[in-house]
């Protein structure tokens, strides 16, 4: 369904995603241009395919990150709050933070403690010279924590945007409960056969679901292996 391209730079990768029509929104394009995968992916960072980041985990293919930012952009406005479940390398946390800055909040949840520590280091290298994001980090409005993504966050809080980087057999009610009205969730659902779905909650709290395309993700309930998303 998709083709892998190994590009020479982050700018070339983003341009490829634009030309491939995965990216058309200017704010999403700007966020991906500002968030270099080289900080988050040590191997072939500019190839449009999943890559190993250690601990049996892969970083999503760039076109999947582009899809997430593109679809969630209406609820990734400055001042919005976002949750990334299965935050892995920390890449999408950083990209979403650039979209909700300066007054927004982004939280990542990852169930592998060692990967949380690695992702925090990745994030700090990326935002080291970004005063706005460093201020968000210092104020704990930009953070990555160890946790069970199926349960959302431990705090009683709600989010405008929720991205789920692992598959669920069905839509977790806990995540629906943590979604604001209006709000959007991007999540892969299914077991042997999976699709990416955009879940929307309107101002009255009514839920709708739109199918985007087939994918293959590791499940939320298990430790990841090499059969990652694409």
From Swiss-Prot:
Q: What is its EC number?
A: 2.1.1.77
The GO biological-process annotations, alphabetized, read as: cellular detoxification; methylation; protein modification process; protein repair
Query: In which compartments does the protein localize?
Result: Cytoplasm, Cytosol; Nucleus
Q: Which GO terms describe its cellular component?
A: cytoplasm; cytosol; nucleus
| Catalytic activity from the UniProt record | [protein]-L-isoaspartate + S-adenosyl-L-methionine = [protein]-L-isoaspartate alpha-methyl ester + S-adenosyl-L-homocysteine
Gene3D superfamilies from the xrefs? Vaccinia Virus protein VP39
Key words, A-Z: Cytoplasm, Methyltransferase, Nucleus, S-adenosyl-L-methionine, Transferase
Protein name, per record: Probable protein-L-isoaspartate O-methyltransferase
Originating species: Schizosaccharomyces pombe (strain 972 / ATCC 24843) (Fission yeast)
